[in-house]
Amino acid sequence: MGKTKIIILAVFVLFGLLITFIYFKKPNSNSALPVQIKNMMTVTSLVFKQNEMIPKQYSCDGENINPPLTIVNVPDNVKSLVLIVDDPDAPSGVWTHWLVWNIDPKTTDIKENSAPANAEVGKNDFGKLEYGGPCPPAGTHRYFFKVYALDTVLNLSQGANRSQLDQIMKGHIIDKGELMGKYSK
């Protein structure tokens, strides 16, 4: 009887170790980003610098138009770019302000108040297919202008949401650049 208990205990311990090993070796399926990317691309703007305040005209308190952006150091093997603008400080969690994909990888400038030509625009968290400027309920929020370089052109229809975009980007990100600005009411 003692040997049977030891064998059963050993089987449970081995099973537990196997489950633990499988769990911790499994890649994080919730992330659109691969484990390692180069982070060589740079995103800048003529109207605000990294960690500075975003001018009022680019917010819901102003003209609510997108700021001009410049993208440099895009890798040669890129097939398309994705632009995501979001606010991680929103009370309900990350709030998406703009989704644009299938941007031509030769694009170096995104003009003020315009989406890149021939790109697809997704539905932001305001429920619109356009840029929605900073509009925090209170306090200072951070706004990230993220540009992803992909090894493919995405087969995703205009009007898709952030979750759909994140899912289809998985495994295709070669590089990323971002600019962070702040805004407060």
What does each model-identified segment do?
Residues 2-185:
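N-terminus-centered regions that define maturation/targeting leaders and the start
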